Amino acid sequence: MILCFSILINNNGFSISPAYSSVEQNNISNPFSSTSSFQSKASILDNLPSQNITVGDINIVYKQIGKSDGKPIILITGAGATMDMWNPLLIENLISANYKVIIFENRGVGQSTVGTKEFSINQFANDTLGLLDALKISKADILGWSLGGFIAQQLALLHPEKVNSLILYATSCGGPSDRPTPPEIMQIITNSSMSPQERVQKDIPFLFPPTNWFKAHSDYLNYLPIPKETITQPILLKQLEAATTWKGTCNALSNITQPTLVIVGADDDAAPDSLTLAEKISGSWFIRIGTAGHGLMYQHPEAFNKLVLTFLENSKEP
């Protein structure tokens, strides 16, 4: 059985209503405590020192935020995203709940090196495993966004002993039946004349579809971190090739036994495929948030963060 909810956002907060019938080394306690605005929190996160560690054939650049004895949670970014694209409000909420948050750059992204191994979802999962082992983390909660959700699923299937719970945000089970990248996004990706910052701005209709939320927020850029790190066009294309050639997990999802939250914006292209994840992962939660797209964690941060923390609280090991 899965728990399915649709989240309706209004001026009074958010409410939860059934959407479908049920279907069978930085020891920093709270770096954000003295600031309130989104951009100032993003700036603090940017200014926290990065570290690097050798994992197999690459050096991975990462940041570890929170108490050293906090419960570890790993955040895995999507295609084209750098670790400074995570919403700092999410990270603040997690460390306030006594989590140790690890964010990192995937292979070839930002200051993480490219290495010699083939770009593939399996390899990205093994890179994440290697980071966990290098940091001496025996088990962690895993949050994967978009392509990061592919990596999280593969990690849970290849190394279930390392995964306490899964949060699959704006993603699918991939494979041949997966929806292709929208043509307008591919045009942006293949335009080598744009800077990474320009690409983010061009991605706005994908992150924030033209819904009532978008129309009501002419200041939408204030809801986005400004990326300082970069991803080159060749690396981005390699990420997309890894995603499109991945066989997916659709036929293996019943083997995922960890508590799982599937969360997606109703206006996201990934929304229809996300339900498949929840249907096939036993006992999973499925949350669909209205008036939200691929960037729902920016559009509705309070709802997103509360849902993530509520799920994590319910998924704690005894």
What are the language-model segments listed below?
Residues S177-R179, Q197-K247, N251-A252:
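Conserved alpha/beta-hydrolase catalytic His-Asp/Glu region
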Residues I256, V262-V264:
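Short beta-strand/loop motif that positions the catalytic acidic residue
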Residues I103, G108-L143:
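Active-site loop/oxyanion-hole signature of alpha/beta-hydrolase fold enzymes
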Residues I58-Q111:
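Conserved HGGG/HGGXW glycine-rich cap/lid loop of the alpha/beta-hydrolase fold
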Residues L157, L166-M194:
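Flexible "cap/lid" loop of the alpha/beta hydrolase fold
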Residues D269-S274:
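Conserved alpha/beta-hydrolase "acid-adjacent" motif
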Residues G149-P160, L166:
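Short glycine-enriched nucleophile-adjacent loop
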Residues S284-P318:
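Catalytic active-site module of serine/aspartate enzymes centered on a nucleophile-bearing elbow/loop
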